Amino acid sequence: MPDSHLPYHPHGHPPKPGERVPAGNIAFLFPGQGSQKVGMGKELAELYPVAMETFQEADAALGYKLSQVCWEGPEEKLKLTEITQPAILTMSVAVFRVLREMGIVPRYAAGHSLGEYSAHVAAGTLRFEDAVRTVRHRGKYMQEAVPVGQGAMAAILGMPLAQVAQICAQAAQHQVCQPANINSPDQVVISGSAPAVERAAELAKERGAKKAIMLPVSAPFHCALMKPAQERLAADLKKLFFSPPEVPVACNVDALLMETADKSCDALIRQVTGAVRWEESMRLLIARGVETFLEAGPGKVLCGLMRQIDRGRTCLNVEDEASLQKVANHFGQAKTD
């Protein structure tokens, strides 16, 4: 495993002379779909050439101006899954590269669902241009796997996972209904056939869940209904070159650290129909001694989940200049204390 005090560059460029590297055990977290917003990344791209270059690389790889959609919208276009996924990946990688230029580098990486691709770019497992094209296809395949309206997802709050799983099994009635995102002790998202998910949400409320909220999603992610998408994506992923991760990546589907190229590819394939075991992944990193988590990309969803998992850990988000300077100050203070 690389020394956390040695900045690395996935494509071999050395750090700048005198680059300041914070001591301590840092994990970078990368958000998934749903965190997108019009304007994301624009300020950083205007201030940091490496962020602008990242958006330009994405534009070239995709053959259209993704940057324009991210910065100007319209929101309806940015919400299209095959645009949302490369947009969030690009924003996340731009933030990662700015942090790296500042000498703030991770010892571990993890990403929620789509964010796992961002984590692999940060770890040097995947080339950015390969990842951005692949997640465009991933979004398209997921959207096409189930006709609109036939699938659904719901967030169940304040109910233990075992009870949620039991309710899913009861509600299924020969349809698909299963835990899809095990986000925190307080939040499990379920996914499957719309009638089954609706039945499960009602059962959860009857049996004491704090809330059961139907989510405004375009497809039922991370469940067996995504099998057609999984098969199409597997064919794409198997054509890509995966390098051994330069830092371990906590994978969603197993809540284990990926430290080899072949396992990384396999985990991304299985992730399409498998649950995101986020809480377990975070507890794994905590057990490895991670002191500070940085959420690199739009929004603060993962920092919010970390507060539910372990309030004693520091989790900071970076999505614009103000949040970036807050993180820089945090590490500057940490170094001189």
Locations of regions flagged by a protein language model:
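NAD(P)-dependent dehydrogenase/reductase Rossmann-like domain
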Residues: 196-197, 236, 312, 321-337
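Alpha/beta catalytic cores of group-transfer enzymes, especially the acyltransferase/condensing modules
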Residues: 33-35, 62-64, 123-274
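A short, acidic, amphipathic alpha-helical segment used as a generic capping/interface helix at domain edges
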Residues: 274-290
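FabD-like malonyl-/acyl-CoA
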Residues: 2-164, 215, 292-326
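Short, solvent-exposed amphipathic alpha-helical segments in soluble enzyme
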Residues: 45-46, 170-172, 205-207, 308-311, ...
